Amino acid sequence: MGSSFGDLFRISTFGESHGGGVGVIVEGCPPRLNLSVESIQAELDRRKPGQSHITTPRKEADQVQVLSGLLDGETTLGTPIAMVVRNKDQRPGDYKDMAVAFRPSHADATYQAKYGIQARSGGGRASARETIGRVAAGAIAKQLLKQAAGTEILAWVKRIHNIEASGIDPQRVQLSDVEANIVRCPESAVAERMVERIEAIGREGDSCGGVIECVVRHPAVGLGMPVFDKLEADLAKAVMSLPATKGFEIGSGFDGTLLKGSEHNDAFLPSDDGRLKTATNNSGGIQGGISNGEPIVIRVAFKPTATIRKEQQTIDSDGKATTLAGKGRHDPCVLPRAVPMVEAMVALVLADHLLRQQGQCSLW
């Protein structure tokens, strides 16, 4: 329960952080899609641990193995695509103290309360290693969207702690800009300050959070359903299912509450190709729950990493007061590695809605 996502383009992830491996089964991918396994691996490389000194030092190759669903390793058959990544660098001993004391703001206590048992080593399904399956599946969804609709999805770090990049143009930013530094912020000068802040907070044995911004360029028009399956609602659910997420906004977001209707409304403009075009994009590319063809722009808030080296007050499994200083290898800030996770979840939502749109509205 709770490990599957999507309707027509549907994924199911499996595995624990310190188990034999993690992976995903993708169902509903159309046949005859030219699929690059190298592109899947490239997305996983952006997510994997140990890629810089500001991420967890856990060393994992995160090499994907595609078990089914492809012809000659490059063409989808329309059958389930199964992918697995083996865990290689587990250290269960790092979690000895956490086996008897709950980590504040982590899933330890709530998993124990719900199930009466928990995978204490590595956090089990609450670990960010679960997102390997999402990123692998999202890489397939990205390729489907690009080939079928010309859609591009790109995310970047907008804020770390209280350091924010305010000059990024979602229409112009490129992947090379995002990947130019280890924090994945396109503004190089701001990125340097972000890295310094993560380093300083990490030296204190503490952690920090921030905001990731994501743009969808050239989205198909008409994606989304009225009422309960609005596109922004499904996007919110998707990204808010990622570990450590605490907030979501689209378009003008909460700042839009400071505007009057005459200031916030996106005026329609004539276009030569018959597509909808607006003078502004406060709606973030979605109106009435349905995409209008303008860029979809969202922002996602991530809390500080829960497991920190600083000693904290907590309780043990018997409910008695104790203290805990986290051990193990954890990111002082999840934002740099969360960028491909956000892109993946956005891609999964759009791929699912693209298939739903084709199935309902393209018969005649």
From Swiss-Prot:
Its cofactor is FMNH2. SUPFAM superfamilies: Chorismate synthase, AroC. Disulfide bonds: none annotated. Pathway: Metabolic intermediate biosynthesis; chorismate biosynthesis; chorismate from D-erythrose 4-phosphate and phosphoenolpyruvate: step 7/7. It comes from the Bacteria. NADP(+) binds at R47. The keyword Cytoplasm does not apply. One of its GO terms (molecular function) is FMN binding. GO terms for cellular component: cytosol. GO terms for biological process: amino acid biosynthetic process; aromatic amino acid family biosynthetic process; chorismate biosynthetic process. PANTHER family: CHORISMATE SYNTHASE. Belongs to the chorismate synthase family. This is Chorismate synthase. It comes from Synechococcus sp. (strain CC9605). The gene is aroC.
